[in-house]
Amino acid sequence: MTLDIVNWKAIVEALLYAAGDEGLTKKQLLSVLEVDEAELLDIMLDVKETYEKEDRGIELVEYADTYMLSTKKEFAVYLKKLIEAPSKGLSQAALEVLAIVSYKQPITRAEVEEIRGVKSERILQSLVAKALLCEVGRADGPGRAILYGTTETFLEQFGLKTLEELPPLPENVEEDGVQEEADLFFENFNQTFEDLK
């Protein structure tokens, strides 16, 4: 490929944005961009310098050969205000994500999205901001994806002492009844939530 450095930066930015808080490993970037390691390092250095020079709210960070976009520390006070601002109740989508995480934890964003069939990154971030979910570790394998789990706040908000008090999942559902199982699952979870209001 013979794109100029500006196009490479835009492509990398799009890839890292799509990857979210899990970021992308050097190996993944090399594979997707089809460049050699020296070219990748030049591209990533240029991306990093661009974020540092310009008045941007985000920066490029690297840890354990993984790159990700992160908010700059100097804007933490504003993020804190956002997190602490009063917010409306949970949407249907947020309840679905909470249900999935509460029963399947620890679980990665990709696994949540596979179950739901739609992107769930922003919902997960919102639930973390509301202190209903938190990072409980990192998955093994490439990228070391974040594992999510519920919090004490989740238990308090739903009137639970332990996760064992969650409504039981339907048992013995055939493979082609998975969608029906999911519908029952969310219906049961939502009913429990409504009962606690």
UniProtKB/Swiss-Prot annotation:
One GO location term (cellular component): cytoplasm
Family matches, as Gene3D superfamilies: Winged helix-like DNA-binding domain superfamily/Winged helix DNA-binding domain
Membrane-crossing residue ranges in chain numbering: none
Protein localization: Cytoplasm
Keyword Cell cycle listed: yes
Xref: Pfam families: SMC_ScpB
Keywords: Cell cycle, Cell division, Chromosome partition, Cytoplasm
Principal subcellular localisation of the protein: cytoplasm
Family indicated by similarity: Belongs to the ScpB family.
PANTHER family named among the record's database cross-references: SEGREGATION AND CONDENSATION PROTEIN B
Subunit field text: Homodimer. Homodimerization may be required to stabilize the binding of ScpA to the Smc head domains. Component of a cohesin-like complex composed of ScpA, ScpB and the Smc homodimer, in which ScpA and ScpB bind to the head domain of Smc. The presence of the three proteins is required for the association of the complex with DNA.
Annotated protein name in UniProt: Segregation and condensation protein B
Organism from which the protein derives: Bacillus licheniformis (strain ATCC 14580 / DSM 13 / JCM 2505 / CCUG 7422 / NBRC 12200 / NCIMB 9375 / NCTC 10341 / NRRL NRS-1264 / Gibson 46)
Source species taxonomy: Bacteria, Bacillati, Bacillota, Bacilli, Bacillales
